[in-house]
Amino acid sequence: MTDATVGIVLVSHSAELAAGAAHLAAQVSGGTVTIIAAGGTDDGDLGTSAAKVERGLSEADSGAGVVVLPDLGSAVLTVRAVLEDYGDAESVLLADAPFVEGAVAATVTAAAGGDIKAVAAAAEEARHARKL
């Protein structure tokens, strides 16, 4: 049995949005889940960066896999492009989930020891959580 937990990469067009969502999600895990913010371009502008996504995947993977949450459609394209050439793409799941709620739900599930499929499912199911 391993102590590895599923890692999470948050891919946003905004470095600040990714960092803020990562900070919020980290609060619910008590620091037990690796959450990487991969936001903005390499030169600090709005957009996405394949290099940041690839680094994020490597940093987040402790052996249990990585769930990636993108903020908008073109972030999905960036992640998919990275996964085409990524050495261990089978250990990565791209979640179709609300960005903030999905990040928190994924983190809670990863912290509880959920496997990669459970973590991705929790992120995706967060879309059904009612606020009012």
List the predicted regions and their residue ranges.
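N-terminal loops that bind phosphate or other acidic moieties
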Residues: 1-132
